[in-house]
Each structure stands twice: as structure tokens, then as C-alpha cells.
Amino acid sequence: QLPETIEKSEFKTIADLGKERLRRVIKEIKVLIQAQKEKEAATIFGDSDKYKLDLGFKVFKLSKSNFKIWDSTLEKEPEVIQAKLFEHIQHISPEAEQEAILYELLLKSGFELTTPIEKLTLAGLTVFSIAEGQLLICLEKELTHDCIKAMAEMQPTRVICLDEGFKGENADALKTNAVQIMKSKGVVNFRTV
């Protein structure tokens, strides 16, 4: 929702009005659930698990990318190109939060914001499973062979890892092995950002 202003209202924008309406509905649902739980608690066969609902919502705002964008209009001078290359070694904004990077990659991969995301722990590292394992995203800054192997064994269609996750003196070997491990398990698209 664009931040369209509202005249003659206690809310500044339509988005603010929508958020308040959602909050009120959630509050009403919680009251109804509590009343039903109390009613069922009086019976022997009360089942409170059926009332476990996700009653939250997220608000997304359009903002600049978390990734630096390459300027293709650069002069052809080798010194200028070299300077720009060094600037892009660290191409993720230092202020970027993990959740913001995750959702940006989700959108850039063609998924909707409502796509189910599951947080997994593979070989001690956090990996996000998108759309029931179609896409795995690992935003860890120190990848391990075991984590790469565990992701590949899940046989997703696509895997995205941070380029900076491949660190140390064996970084190139780990990245090369990651590509081969993914291919051997049928992962169609493995890339780093």
C-alpha cells in the first residue's frame, strides 16, 4: 500500500488505518478464542491445541536495496574500474539486517512475501527453507563443508549463499566443492551473492 494520505482522520495514511484495523481484529479474535477455551475447559474433552493461530502481521516498506549496484556507465580507464572493483568487494550494505536481506533475495528469486519460510539449523548453521524447500538461503558468514552438504542433501531446486560465507585460506576450494556437491545432488541453481 502506498503511503496515501487521508484527510479528516486520526490516521495519517491508508496503511496506518489498515494496520489499526488488523490490530483490532486480532484483539477481537483473541477475546473470542479465550472465551471458547474457558467454555471447553469446563468439559472433559476440551482441545486447546486447535486454537493455536498465527495472529500477527508484518509490514513491509519499500526502501533501497541492501546490495550495492554496479555502475555500468563507468569510464573505461583501468584505474577507475579497479577502484570500483575494490569498492564492491563488500557489496552488502553494512546496515543491512538479516531479515531484510532474506526478503530481498526472496523477492528477487520470484517468490511472494507471503511464501512460507522455515528457519532450519543444518550442521549448526541457520538456513532458511523457502516454499517447502524449493529454495534454501544461507546468510551465514562462515560456511562449512558439512552445512553445504546438508543443504545439498535436501535437494532443493535452488540454493543461495553469501559470497562472504566462503572465508579463510580454503575459501576457493570450499566454493568449488560446494558447486560440485550441489550438482551431484541435483541442485539446478547454486549461486552466491
Kindly label every feature range from the protein language model.
Residues 1-193:
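Accessory, often C-terminal, charged low-complexity segments
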